Amino acid sequence: MNVIDLLILDNEKYKKQFRKNKLFKIKFDSTLRKNKFLKHFRIWSDEFQKMVLARVVFSETKEFKQLAWDHLTDEFGHNIELSQNLENDKETTDSIFEALGSWFTLKMMTLGDSERAVLVHLVIESCATIFYEKLGSIFCNHKASQHFKTHMHLDPEHEQMGINLLKQININDFSLLIIQKKGWDMIDALFTRLAEITTIPDNF
């Protein structure tokens, strides 16, 4: 079995595990909780923009540069759209959540092209497909509903575009399996932390 087949096979395992994330067990039974969640989710939305921009800057080969540009073109400004549709646009902070998110941006500056593709498309976009599938209906009547609708449409395509390029160039680097696992560990921790800060009482 080649590396691409192993990456895809392992990704199904990681996706299955991610579906059990603590975030998806939260009851979004009040507008207050939904707004609190979105206020913190905005931190990751902003960091994601930094990450895709950094990927474009640090991409090396022609094929991966084009992939990075195509991805950025689809994603650019989604964080601004989200922030404009929050009930309260006052910024919030959480050091642990921010540190987990910034790990991905740092990796865009230090890894190679194929590793970046695995992190972005097989980890983050695969995770996003599940995230928006699980939460999209919950926010369908919220001011921020368009953000969820957009990503429910785009993210499955974004997941596949990275896989397609890795197949096309016939990559055979087994170290990609290591960064894939690290990425899933980090994204699972990131959304676990998001669940924690969403459910912490406001007077805590």
Curated annotation (Swiss-Prot):
Protein name: Uncharacterized protein RP592
Biological source species: Rickettsia prowazekii (strain Madrid E)
